Amino acid sequence: TTVKFQLFEMEQGFHRVLAKGMVDRIGLPGSKIVVRADNGYEFSCECPVTDHKDAIKAILDYLSHRFLKNAAELSAVGHRMGHGGEYFDRSVIIDDDVMAKIYDTLPLLPLHGPAFVHGVEAMTELLPGVLQVATFDSAFHQSVEKPAFTYAIPREYYEKERIRRYGFHGTSHNYAAQKAAELFGRAGRFICCHLGGGASVTAIKDGKS
């Protein structure tokens, strides 16, 4: 029921968060948009939001009013996608082939997967031609070897239904691993705990899950 966003100004490796916020209670009474700018300005108001397209339109309208001449000024849009199955081990530019693979992974993430897809579809409709990139929570964990990701169940469940250990919160674990390596001066071995809306623990060796 929520879409979160951040607006970045990016130039030659430098980036700054101009604004961030969310549209909450999508499809429910009392839906609202909340925005916090980098200068401390905060904005919140109720607005009727029936679906993810309405939410993204509300975000683009607000950003166009406060930070952009128009939404077409955006150079690219990044999407956090929940599941990339075994297709993706890194972020990718979204095209028809990528979308087909994302649709194919929906049975692996039936609760949240459709919402991620709706976001891409809405942005494609509202900003046709703007580059879109998908980052997958499961991508970081594609380095896990088969003995570690295989469950002790009949092999056909993996071969036919793709039931295996995938790993999640990969973008968070990857970032934490990089920062830990910077602090300790080496990659090494780490146990990384992600504690947020969900929780997960990952063993990381030499920067890999």
What positions do the PLM features span?
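Conserved active-site and cofactor/substrate-binding residues in soluble primary-metabolism enzymes
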Residues: 50-54, 93, 97, 114-118, ...
